[in-house]
Amino acid sequence: MNQMLPEQLLNQLNLVEKALAALRNGQGVLVADDPGRENEADLIFPAESVTIPQMALLIRECSGIVCLCMTDGKIRSLELPMMVENNTSGFQTAFTVSIEAAEGVTTGVSAADRVKTVRTAVSENARPSDLRHPGHIFPLRARPGGVLERPGHTEATVDLMRLAGLSPAGVLCELTNPDGSMAGIEETFAFSVQHGFPVLSIGDIVAYRKSLLQTGSQGLSA
């Protein structure tokens, strides 16, 4: 690390590096949103390696709406239409139609079935016919510019996977409290300590990417 960098930036870069190391090891990370935006934390795992126990954790401890963040190119290759033609969502979250694996699942609801659907969708050789609609996994289309274009969890997920050298796809779900309310920052850190997940913010990822651009480093690939 450059010792001349401001302390705050160094801290942000270190947080991202810890998260990338965890993702490379197939572990999860918690990404917090800006307090002035959605003000929530999402639990994120690499799509290429997500396990049944990890999926069960997402279903049990989070909102249950498990999303699969993918690039625009991947969404197009799977011929997934957007959920609505006119997106009136306040944050322009780009949902496509929901999906289910065409083979190898039963009702599609179980953790094992959802992992099968994710693995099917992100396979390099995946075809549109490999998926059925509707289903219990909700794909999200990331903007090409990542968090520098849209500072959302969808873009943060794809950016993190690329920065980690993984396939640019990840699963996420919003962290909730036992009473069903959204987890705040204190609950997020408590959950992090309990499960050993690194915590970082979308702002940290923005700072990391801007630092790469300033130094000319190649952190993202198509």
UniProtKB/Swiss-Prot annotation:
InterPro entries: DHBP_synth_RibB-like_a/b_dom, DHBP_synthase_RibB. Mg(2+) 2 binds at residues 38, 153. Binds 2 divalent metal cations per subunit. Magnesium or manganese. Coiled coil: none annotated. GO terms for molecular function: 3,4-dihydroxy-2-butanone-4-phosphate synthase activity; magnesium ion binding; manganese ion binding. GO terms for cellular component: cytosol. GO terms for biological process: riboflavin biosynthetic process. Pathway: Cofactor biosynthesis; riboflavin biosynthesis; 2-hydroxy-3-oxobutyl phosphate from D-ribulose 5-phosphate: step 1/1. D-ribulose 5-phosphate binds at residues 37-38, 42, 150-154, 174. Its EC number is 4.1.99.12. Keywords: Lyase, Magnesium, Manganese, Metal-binding, Riboflavin biosynthesis. Mg(2+) 1 binds at residue 38. It catalyses: D-ribulose 5-phosphate = (2S)-2-hydroxy-3-oxobutyl phosphate + formate + H(+). Its cofactor is Mg(2+); Mn(2+). Homodimer. Catalyzes the conversion of D-ribulose 5-phosphate to formate and 3,4-dihydroxy-2-butanone 4-phosphate. This is 3,4-dihydroxy-2-butanone 4-phosphate synthase. It comes from Chlorobium limicola (strain DSM 245 / NBRC 103803 / 6330).
